[in-house]
């Protein structure tokens, strides 16, 4: 059994990845990803480059984001934007069970460290997931709904919110385009910019902090 030590779990994961394994480590609350910053920022994200490309760290860190019922402040944060600013780490934000499986499969095959943030509010959702193998490429956004009047860029569980908003807007004669980036590192800038060029308006719906 792994110790209840986030730093220990991450350290063992980095070491295992360096020796050729493809570990998936689980940090139960994304809030406690602050306890693995040394291992993820100064080790996992940099070893490939500091070794002149001789070493890879194919590590997947699975954790979560967002608030949930009966959770204190230190269990209700969304730190994905902070992690996305660390060079060398990839960040995925699945918006459904289907996306979660496909992105996880892709992450495991990636030779770089990947952090997957799952929204706590979606853990009770039930949805069909294909049993057969499938992958969802990183850096390819999913246009959930096409529109011409406004672009709604939504991440994680906020994709469901955006889709409901688009339905309400349609009743008012406003056609909203809903886009799920799937990954914010790498980010599919082309799909997002092409949509905004078409609609001339954009709203970002994300559980991260609005300002610094």
Each PLM stretch: what is its role?
Residues 1-113, 117, 120-212:
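Thiamine diphosphate
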């Amino acid at each position: 059994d792994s110790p209840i030590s986030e730093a220990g779990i991450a350290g063992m994961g980095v070491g295992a990845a360096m020796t050729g394994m493809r570990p998936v480590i689980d940090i139960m609350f994304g809030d406690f990803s602050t306890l693995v910053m040394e291992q993820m920022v100064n080790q996992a994200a940099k070893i490939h480059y500091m070794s002149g490309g001789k070493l890879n760290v194919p590590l997947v860190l699975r954790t979560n984001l967002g608030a949930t019922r009966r959770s204190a402040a230190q269990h209700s944060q969304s730190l994905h934007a902070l992690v996305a600013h660390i060079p060398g780490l990839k960040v995925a934000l699945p918006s459904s069970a289907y996306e979660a499986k496909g992105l996880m499969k892709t992450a495991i095959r990636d030779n770089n460290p990947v952090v997957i943030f799952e929204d706590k509010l979606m853990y009770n959702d039930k949805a069909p997931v294909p049993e057969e193998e499938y992958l969802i490429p990183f850096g390819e956004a999913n246009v959930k709904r096409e529109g011409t009047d406004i672009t709604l860029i939504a991440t994680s569980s906020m994709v469901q919110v955006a889709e409901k908003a688009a339905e309400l807007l349609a009743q008012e004669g406003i056609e909203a385009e809903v886009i799920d980036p799937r990954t914010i590192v790498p980010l599919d800038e082309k799909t997002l910019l092409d949509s905004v060029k078409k609609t001339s308006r954009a709203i970002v719906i994300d559980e991260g902090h609005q300002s610094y």
